[in-house]
């Protein structure tokens, strides 16, 4: 980074010696903050364009007026520049760039094809298991809907391996015809079961027409052999598949994998909607609401930013339909094709089929934007009401709330949840494992959590919240006041939310450093609703974090005490049996069935849990 810009930046000299090769440029303001990151096929031409005499866009003029220095990184190709640009935008989140929310991972459907009787399941995260992954889907709901629909047609099991390995009779899923019961011998043959698995895979690959054709042949064959009950079963499957097909706008064989990206704008707000079609099947949709950095809205520029940020580490379809013209369409196609190692095209909707898809995506985007604007108005009203109730100088747009959770004083965890403009910012949540206090001392736990949180905030110069919410009464509030005095941050607005009579919702009392008598709001007050929402979210996160810590202690500590049992063996035991209780109850012969467990180790584990070690 430039050295605090102690010397005057000479733009003319900089541009004179700037290369004409592709690369990325970073613009800094006078304080040394990166305010914009851009890419260019020709760095000299692109960067020079910012410093011409007049600009049509106010955004560009405002940006240029704040530039104190520029750095460039030269790349071999424009595609490399695009990847680097995206990485830097995600890392630095510059004020004038278009920023889309970074989903940590998208969900997939997983088929455990390596098993004798494969299962079908929801999957999110690293792809370490052996099998087939289908996706990504835009959200968890789309996965669950697909799994539910498939289960009705092809009764492939959706249970975990530990449950499957320990069934002695079929579960409820078998009774309601959602599973063919491969866990119990004699209910379904391996060949019959794998036929359903292959049909499921073919459907997920977008080959539903092939599946229908195959089922049609089997129906005819069963009918010819007078197996009318079996023929009726195939007929019902065909009908169910056709019903699914009828719900999709693309329903012809050989359809390309296609994503449809549409943009809607209103009141200087934007919604980008993506609809994912795979093999003719609609896998779902997702709406995104980018931060556009106070700039004027350029639909093509926003969609380009979406494409670069969305597909940087996701599977790329063969075709992307867009609602607006993209200036950098050619370079985006080149980059996407290089990533996919196959031709990728970006198009406007021309054919009737594509126009139908785009119309649906635009409707989705417009609907999502209206809902977002309505929700924002409601949230802004609640934040303003809270400002009035607590007599704050400005709206509490950045709020942080703390809560404590433990079981009889053990595995104590403090939570800190963050709300921005009345909405949870889950990526900013923090938890604190509390150590070195008297078990059950909530005051000491709160003191430690607040000290750790704001010591770091102060040390690193991070933004301070507009309001800190404490779950508790005057005692907890006074502990917080002591911490902030010690940290010399005693001007921060604080409020504690104490449970009212009978601990009933709506009867809470609010305490602030300047109002020790308490503020008693009506149960339907929207400011109280917001505080209760924040407090309940802190409570939920504290309990979830505490349970995780407690479970980890209970599950792993005893296994760690067994001589000769290392981390890999512990993992194999828990994966195979599904939990510590099942490991405890297992016989020596059952323990030996776990891969890598010898007779000697199995006996050692058994003896440990049965009091002989």
Swiss-Prot record:
What the protein does comes down to: The UvrABC repair system catalyzes the recognition and processing of DNA lesions. UvrC both incises the 5' and 3' sides of the lesion. The N-terminal half is responsible for the 3' incision and the C-terminal half is responsible for the 5' incision.
Q: Does the keyword DNA damage apply?
A: yes
Please list the residue ranges annotated as the UVR domain: 209-244
Species whose genome carries this gene: Hydrogenovibrio crunogenus (strain DSM 25203 / XCL-2)
Q: Which HAMAP family does its entry note?
A: UvrC (MF_00203)
The record's GO CC annotations read:
cytoplasm; excinuclease repair complex
Where are the disulfide bridges?
none
- SMART domains named in the record: GIYc, HhH1
**What is this protein called in UniProt?**
UvrABC system protein C
Q: Name one GO molecular function term.
A: DNA binding
Q: Which InterPro entries match?
A: GIY-YIG_endonuc, GIY-YIG_endonuc_sf, GIY-YIG_UvrC_Cho, Hlx-hairpin-Hlx_DNA-bd_motif, RuvA_2-like, UVR_dom, UVR_dom_sf, UvrABC_protein_C
Q: Which UniProt keywords apply?
A: Cytoplasm, DNA damage, DNA excision, DNA repair, Excision nuclease, SOS response
Query: What residue stretches are annotated with the GIY-YIG domain?
Result: 20-98
Q: Which family does it belong to?
A: Belongs to the UvrC family.
Instruction: Give the principal location in a single coarse category.
Output: cytoplasm
Q: Name one Pfam family in it.
A: HHH_5
* Protein's GO biological process: nucleotide-excision repair; SOS response
Organism phylogeny: Bacteria, Pseudomonadati, Pseudomonadota, Gammaproteobacteria, Thiotrichales
Subunit composition? Interacts with UvrB in an incision complex.
Q: Which NCBIfam families match?
A: PRK00558.1-5, uvrC
């Amino acid at each position: 980074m430039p050295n605090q810009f102690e010397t005057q930046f000479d733009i003319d000299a900089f541009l004179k010696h700037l290369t004409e090769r592709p690369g990325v440029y970073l613009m800094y303001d006078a304080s040394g903050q990166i305010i914009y990151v851009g890419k260019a096929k020709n760095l000299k031409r692109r960067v020079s364009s910012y410093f011409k005499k007049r600009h049509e866009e106010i955004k560009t003029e405002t940006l240029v007026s704040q530039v104190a220095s520029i750095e460039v990184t030269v790349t071999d190709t424009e595609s490399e520049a695009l990847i680097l640009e995206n990485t830097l935008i995600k890392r630095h989140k510059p004020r004038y760039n278009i920023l889309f929310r970074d989903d940590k991972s998208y969900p997939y459907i997983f088929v455990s094809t390596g098993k004798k009787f494969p299962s079908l399941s929801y999957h999110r995260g690293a792809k370490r298991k052996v099998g087939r992954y289908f996706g990504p889907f835009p959200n968890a709901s789309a996965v669950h809907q697909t799994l539910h629909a498939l289960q009705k047609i092809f009764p492939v099991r959706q249970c975990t391996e530990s449950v499957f390995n320990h069934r002695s009779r079929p579960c409820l899923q078998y009774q309601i015809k959602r599973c063919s019961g491969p866990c119990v011998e004699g209910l379904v043959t391996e060949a019959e079961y794998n036929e359903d698995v292959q049909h499921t895979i073919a459907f997920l690959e977008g080959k539903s027409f092939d599946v229908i054709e195959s089922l049609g042949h089997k129906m005819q064959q069963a009918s010819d052999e007078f197996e009318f009950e079996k023929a009726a079963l195939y007929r019902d499957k065909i009908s169910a598949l056709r019903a699914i097909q009828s719900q999709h706008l693309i329903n012809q064989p050989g359809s390309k994998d296609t994503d449809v990206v549409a943009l809607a704008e209103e009141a200087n707000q934007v919604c980008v909607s993506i609809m994912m079609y795979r093999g003719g099947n609609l896998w779902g949709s997702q709406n995104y609401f980018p931060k556009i950095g106070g700039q004027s809205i350029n639909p093509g520029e926003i969609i380009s930013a979406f494409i670069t940020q969305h597909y940087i580490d996701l599977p790329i379809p063969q075709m992307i339909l867009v609602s607006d013209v993209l200036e950098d369409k050619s370079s985006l196609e080149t980059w996407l094709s290089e990533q996919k190692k196959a031709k990728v095209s970006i198009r406007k909707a021309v054919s009737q089929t594509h126009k139908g898809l785009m119309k649906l995506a635009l409707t989705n985007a417009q609907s999502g934007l209206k809902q977002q604007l309505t929700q924002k108005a409601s949230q802004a009203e609640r934040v303003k009401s809270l400002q009035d109730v607590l007599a704050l100088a400005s709206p509490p747009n950045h709020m942080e709330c703390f809560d404590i959770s433990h079981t009889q004083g053990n595995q104590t965890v403090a939570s800190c949840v963050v709300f921005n403009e009345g909405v949870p910012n889950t990526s900013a949540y923090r938890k604190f494992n509390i150590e070195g206090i008297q078990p059950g001392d909530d005051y000491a736990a709160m003191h430690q959590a607040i000290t750790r949180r704001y010591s770091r905030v102060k040390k690193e110069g991070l933004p301070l919240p507009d309001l800190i919410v404490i779950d508790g009464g005057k005692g907890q509030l006074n502990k917080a006041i002591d911490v902030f005095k010690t940290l010399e941050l005693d001007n921060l607005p604080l409020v504690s939310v104490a449970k009212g009579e009978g601990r009933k919702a709506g009867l809470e009392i609010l305490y602030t450093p300047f109002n020790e008598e308490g503020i008693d709001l009506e149960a339907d007050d929207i400011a109280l609703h917001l505080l209760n929402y924040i407090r309940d979210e802190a409570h939920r996160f504290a309990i979830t974090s505490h349970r995780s810590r407690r479970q980890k202690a209970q599950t792993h500590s005893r296994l760690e005490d067994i001589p000769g049992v290392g981390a890999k063996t512990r993992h194999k035991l828990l994966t195979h049996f599904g939990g510590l209780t099942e490991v405890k109850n297992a016989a020596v012969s059952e323990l030996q069935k776990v891969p890598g467990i010898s007779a000697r180790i199995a006996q050692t584990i058994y003896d440990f849990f049965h009091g002989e070690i």
